[in-house]
Amino acid sequence: MSELLNRRLSLLGANLPLLKQCLHGIERECLRVTDEGRLAQTPHPEALGSALTNEQITTDYSESLLEFITPALADPAKVLESLEETHRFVYSKLGDEYLWSPSMPCTLPAEEDIPIAEYGSSNIGKLKHVYRKGLALRYGRTMQCIAGIHYNFSLPEALWPLLREAEGSTENDRDYQSSAYIALIRNFRRYSWLLMYLFGASPALDKGFLRGRPHQLEELDAETLFLPYATSLRMSDLGYQSNAQAGLTPCYNNLASYTDSLRKAVGTPYPPYVEIGTHVDGEWVQLNTNILQIENEYYSNIRPKRVTYTGERPIQALTSRGVQYVEVRCLDINPFLPVGIDLTEARFLDAFLLFCALEDSPQLDNGECGQCTSNFLTVVKEGRRPGLELHRNGQPISLKDWASELIGRIRQLANLLDQAQGSDEHAKALDAQQAKVDDTSLTPSAQVLARMTEHDESFVQFSLRQSRVHAETFREQPLSNEKQQAFETLARESLARQSELEQNEVGDFDLFVGAYQASILAISS
């Protein structure tokens, strides 16, 4: 254990109540499917409100890809309760459709028949739609149908000044906090392979997903492709490469270098996109011809975040007010869990992220950056391979040894969290993960393959069965009238807000896009 972590643990031990002020939020994406396990071609249900203005129920890429968003709360149990209630409400409005249980998609229609999400006729609604048309053009619609869990986490705001003072930092509070979150992200890059081993749940996929493209996967049956030791094919390259983003590798050495690299990417034309242009036959097909249309197009496993004001762009918020929380984006949906994640996973994530934040986090040089990427990709493709070795400081080390050692180091944070909350829940969550390290058959990825083999099911058959099991769970536990009414009010109010936006819209869409592009160039370095 580093001396820095020791000192920080002592400081936390003397300020235990602070640890009850960490905030958590979850975003869960999931496809709407028919009772045959095919993509639902119906519009976003009006009974769920406006996908543009409902803050709890929206759509991601496709009209058929729902996204549920919880509030940020201090108690992860309450966050999961909120997510569960959203699922129960949605099921009361879904008719004979289902929410798809895993991350990898159901049987998809032809590429051009995957519906892109619609957000109405306001300028901001049209901007969101054109952005998604650009994603289709650049990466294909099929790729955009993969779903995941995003876990948002922040440390208590009151902790940063204490740490800054104890360490005699010359940075102001805001910059110290941003530097600390970027340090968390560097450690996350070092250790996130562990999350893929423990929580990866996508070792197989529907054959049609690859659209006949060449791949290195094996056949499990006539309809299913897999890799025998894979943990998360969702997070592997799957033969897709974004050449445009290939040169975009911010190694998170400070906030300024991160925002600068993103600002350059949203302002630098990419020749193949320039060749297509922003319009085809007079219709918008992408917002611009730059490497990234907007910041959120940058694909990463974790993002530094700051809540934005209306009309503000993510880079503007980060540059002016610093980092407020991190968004973990590499978590698979666990198809065995009704909402795709449970409290045990959340408790482990809290201890893991706290460890990443407080452990010493030197700058990443190119060699270590490459090693982090390589370890991550090795684990997603063959994390359960017996005797698998990763690389640490350029030296080989067995995954099992390193995982056990890491869990041992994270345990100190789990113990502090338990002391703060007067429980042993975090320690138990760590025990459950250590058991998976000791026995690979306990990992979700192994369990998925075991169930499919046991029931002689294809990926789609297994997934549909799980989706039906969860649907029954939710439908058997309807919300109280009061809760149901609250969701229905949210939905109605969101539709009214969208309608108001559309009625009060002034200004031409082309000018709106121009102003939106210009806003990024106005940010000074």
Curated annotation (Swiss-Prot):
Q: Sorted alphabetically, which keywords does the UniProt record give?
A: ATP-binding, Glutathione biosynthesis, Ligase, Nucleotide-binding
Q: Output the InterPro entries linked to this UniProt entry.
A: Gln_synth/guanido_kin_cat_dom, Glu_cys_ligase, Glut_cys_ligase
User: Its pathway?
Assistant: Sulfur metabolism; glutathione biosynthesis; glutathione from L-cysteine and L-glutamate: step 1/2
Any idea which GO molecular function terms this record carries?
ATP binding; glutamate-cysteine ligase activity; metal ion binding
- Name the NCBIfam families on file: glu_cys_ligase
Query: Species name for this entry?
Result: Pseudomonas putida (strain ATCC 47054 / DSM 6125 / CFBP 8728 / NCIMB 11950 / KT2440)
Gene (UniProt): gshA
Q: Which GO terms describe its cellular component?
A: cytosol
Sorted alphabetically, which Pfam families does this protein's record hold?
Answer: Glu_cys_ligase (PF04262)
Q: What class of enzyme is it?
A: ligase
- What is the name attached to this protein's record? Glutamate--cysteine ligase
Supply the SUPFAM superfamilies for this chain.
Answer: Glutamine synthetase/guanido kinase
Similarity section? Belongs to the glutamate--cysteine ligase type 1 family. Type 1 subfamily.
Per the UniProt entry, what are the Gene Ontology biological process annotations, in alphabetical order?
Answer: glutathione biosynthetic process
PANTHER family attached here?
A: GLUTAMATE--CYSTEINE LIGASE (PTHR38761:SF1)
- EC numbers listed for it are 6.3.2.2
